Every structure is written in structure tokens, then in C-alpha cells.
Amino acid sequence: MTVAIKKTFKTIEDGIANMIAACNHDYKGTFYVGGDDEVHNKMIEEFNAGWVVKEGSKYTKISTKNGGCAWGFVVNTDNDKKFKKGDILKCAGFSAPARNAARGNVLDGGFSINWTGPLYLVGPAGYSIKSTKEGIFG
């Protein structure tokens, strides 16, 4: 399941907070089967509480599991040669972003996201696999 993010924001912090809320919603929808299952509720609670957002000079790093798993990066400067402020980048490794293409922009909205991280790219337009499938099949 993916969540479409359509809202626009004026600050990186607000855009990231909205994106994390969407990821939390996606996580709950992926694993929650209903009822008052204690295990599912604990998993959801731990996931929601485990986000770490660390601002650096060029990127804001977003991690899950209390910083143990790199989730993605957001460009937080206007001086990047390839990307604009707010662009979402997939992880190339634990401490570096993949600089091939942005997966969306937290300030502009208009992208899909899921709890596992920024979506993969397909084709020259940069549409994600899941977004493309939803458009064709759903």
C-alpha cells in the first residue's frame, strides 16, 4: 500500500512531519488486521515512536527503529547543483543518499510514499512502480 501526499508546506520540518504521519498510516494499514490484538498494537506503537530526524548541512537524514535503520534523506539546502530544497532521496547506504533522482518533494507534495522508504523509480519521468501500477490497474 502507498499513501499519496498532496499537501504543500512552507518548512522542511512540517513537510517531513506530514510524510512521517503518512508512513505511520501506511504501516498501520499494512499490518493491522483489526480488533485489539496486543502484538499488532505494540508493533504499531513502536514503529510510530521510532522515527529519528537528524538535520545536517546538506541533508536531513530520516531513520526508523530509533536511528538503527536509514529510511531516506531530504535535501535541506538551496545550494545543491542537482536537487531543490525538500527533495526526497532514497538511501545509497546508511549515511549517504542516492543522488540519481528525487522521489518527491516534501514542500511541493504530489508524490506517493510507503513505510519502507522512498519508492523506486521507473522510466524517464521518475514515477514509482507502485504509483504507476495504481494508475494503470487501480
What is each stretch, according to the model?
Residues 132-138:
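Short acidic DE-rich linear segments
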Residues 85-118:
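A short, surface-exposed interaction/processing loop segment used at functional sites
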Residues 41-84, 89:
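Amphipathic, interaction-prone secondary-structure segments
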